[in-house]
């Protein structure tokens, strides 16, 4: 859904913070889309007495940003203030909600905010038909609660490996397809009624009006899946991202890339920016948002890794200069030509999971310095063929 620009918008929104024994950074980019429909939440210290809890989420809007933006501001409140979430507090003896009350309260919060937004005039009268996925993690001192509604995704890296990931809610999944068909719908070209690419979402009220069916039995359900994981010393980091990231990187590729970048920089905004840029250069045509939450055992900056990365940058700079000097007699080559030549070479120590796309910013900088009057497109469309093997 959504139209494309002639040239991607590569300006980024960034934020970072720390507390409760963790650090976070985030980055979002509009990219090739005509509108920016992503949103996010990052809260260290949850209100109403949960100061040692944190909450992070990414929302991937479609058909507009109304639902995504509202959820980014109000979903946490709907979760933490409903009676199910606070069930353990009724006796007054429990300082924190139980695991089961948290899971139930998260589900209730999603259903309540979805019901609440339905009454907004622009959503009720059909002037706004937007919807949004939501993927998040609520971190308590003892547990992580992973939350997913739609096809954004969260992954946990522990002991250097992906040890958990949420499951995308796609219409072709058997459980999702059965619900859609029971509600009188169909799955065509892997979409709900041939149109919507996700089977669970907030908003999307055009798909939630089947008489005699409850809110979780509609063509599109607002019910999240909630997973609890006991925290461990080996936990390194959590990545939350929209499908603009996952469309071009697997769980393992993204975690390998993040690990390698954490070894050369402790600036989490920079690491997230590298993720977004790399995905753009790998061919992503969607809005892109990523939130990185690092625990105390996350990879640390390594002198050896920094040296290796610096040597790689110098090698790439030298090769770009050589390619452009050699081609100069026939006219200055465009950036895509330079990238195609480099992609055919066996270049050691490229960022794992990112490949040459993970170093395009270095190549672009040299190219622009040597050819300042050439307009770099900053995009990925001209590189998809040359980078397909990376």
From Swiss-Prot:
Lipidation (N-myristoyl glycine): 2
GO MF assignments: magnesium ion binding; manganese ion binding; protein serine/threonine phosphatase activity
Keywords: Cytoplasm, Hydrolase, Isopeptide bond, Lipoprotein, Magnesium, Manganese, Membrane, Metal-binding, Myristate, Phosphoprotein, Protein phosphatase, Ubl conjugation
Modification Phosphoserine, positions: 386
A GO CC annotation given for this chain: membrane
Alphabetical list of Pfam families matching this protein: PP2C (PF00481), PP2C_C (PF07830)
List of residues binding Mn(2+) 1: 60-61
Bias kind Basic and acidic residues: ranges: 1-14
Site of covalent link Glycyl lysine isopeptide (Lys-Gly) (interchain with G-Cter in ISG15): 12
Catalytic activity: O-phospho-L-seryl-[protein] + H2O = L-seryl-[protein] + phosphate; O-phospho-L-threonyl-[protein] + H2O = L-threonyl-[protein] + phosphate
PPM-type phosphatase domain ranges (all copies): 23-295
Enzyme Commission number(s) from the entry: 3.1.3.16
Sites where the protein binds Mn(2+) 2: 60, 243, 286
CDD domains the UniProt entry points to: PP2Cc (cd00143)
PTM field: Isgylation negatively regulates its activity. N-myristoylation is essential for the recognition of its substrates for dephosphorylation.
Subcellular location as annotated: Cytoplasm, Cytosol; Membrane
CC cofactor: Mg(2+); Mn(2+)
Tissue-specificity statement: Isoform 1: Expressed ubiquitously. Isoform 2: Expressed exclusively in testis and intestine. Isoform 3: Expressed exclusively in brain and intestine. Isoform 4: Expressed exclusively in testis and intestine.
Cofactor detail note: Binds 2 magnesium or manganese ions per subunit.
Disordered: region residues: 1-20, 371-390
Chloroplast among keywords: no
Membrane topology according to the record: Lipid-anchor
Protein family per UniProt: Belongs to the PP2C family.
Assembly and oligomerization: Monomer. Interacts with PAK6. Interacts with the phosphorylated form of IKBKB/IKKB.
Role, per record: Enzyme with a broad specificity. Dephosphorylates PRKAA1 and PRKAA2. Inhibits TBK1-mediated antiviral signaling by dephosphorylating it at 'Ser-172'. Plays an important role in the termination of TNF-alpha-mediated NF-kappa-B activation through dephosphorylating and inactivating IKBKB/IKKB.
Protein name (Swiss-Prot/TrEMBL): Protein phosphatase 1B
Lineage: Eukaryota, Metazoa, Chordata, Craniata, Vertebrata
């Amino acid at each position: 859904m959504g139209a494309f620009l002639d040239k991607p918008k590569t300006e980024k929104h960034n934020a970072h913070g720390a507390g409760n024994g963790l650090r976070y950074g985030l980055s979002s980019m509009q990219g090739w889309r005509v509108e920016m429909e992503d949103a996010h939440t990052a809260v260290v210290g949850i209100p109403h007495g949960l100061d040692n809890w944190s909450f992070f989420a990414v929302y991937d809007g479609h058909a507009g940003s109304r639902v995504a933006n509202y959820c980014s501001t109000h979903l946490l409140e709907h979760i933490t203030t409903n009676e199910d979430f606070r069930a353990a507090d009724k006796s007054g003896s429990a300082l924190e909600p139980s695991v089961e009350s948290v899971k139930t309260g998260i589900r209730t919060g999603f259903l309540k905010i979805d019901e609440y937004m339905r009454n907004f005039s622009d959503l009720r009268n059909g002037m706004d038909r937007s919807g949004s996925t939501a993927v998040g993690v609520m971190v308590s001192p003892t547990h992580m609660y992973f939350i997913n509604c739609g096809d954004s995704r969260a992954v946990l890296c522990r002991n250097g490996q992906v040890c958990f990931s949420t499951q995308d809610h796609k219409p072709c999944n058997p459980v999702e397809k059965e619900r859609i068909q029971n509600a009188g719908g169909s799955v065509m070209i892997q979409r709900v009624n041939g149109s919507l690419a996700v089977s669970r979402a907030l908003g999307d009220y055009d798909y939630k009006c089947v008489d005699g069916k409850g809110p979780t039995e509609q063509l599109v359900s607002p019910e999240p899946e909630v997973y609890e994981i006991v925290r461990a010393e080996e936990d390194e980091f959590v990545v939350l991202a929209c499908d603009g990231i996952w469309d071009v990187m697997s769980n393992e590729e993204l975690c390998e890339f993040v690990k390698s970048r954490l070894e050369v920089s402790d600036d989490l905004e920079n690491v997230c920016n590298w993720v977004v840029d790399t995905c753009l250069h790998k061919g992503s045509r969607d809005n892109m948002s990523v939130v990185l939450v690092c625990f105390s055992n996350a990879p640390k900056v390594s002198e050896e890794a920094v040296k290796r990365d610096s040597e790689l940058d110098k090698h790439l700079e030298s090769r770009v200069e050589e390619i452009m000097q050699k081609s100069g007699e026939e006219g200055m080559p465009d950036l895509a030509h330079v990238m195609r030549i480099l992609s055919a070479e066996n270049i050691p120590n490229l960022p794992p999971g990112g490949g040459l796309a993970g170093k395009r910013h270095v190549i672009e900088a040299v190219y622009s310095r040597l050819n300042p009057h050439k307009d770099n497109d900053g995009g990925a469309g001209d590189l998809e063929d040359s980078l397909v093997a990376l």
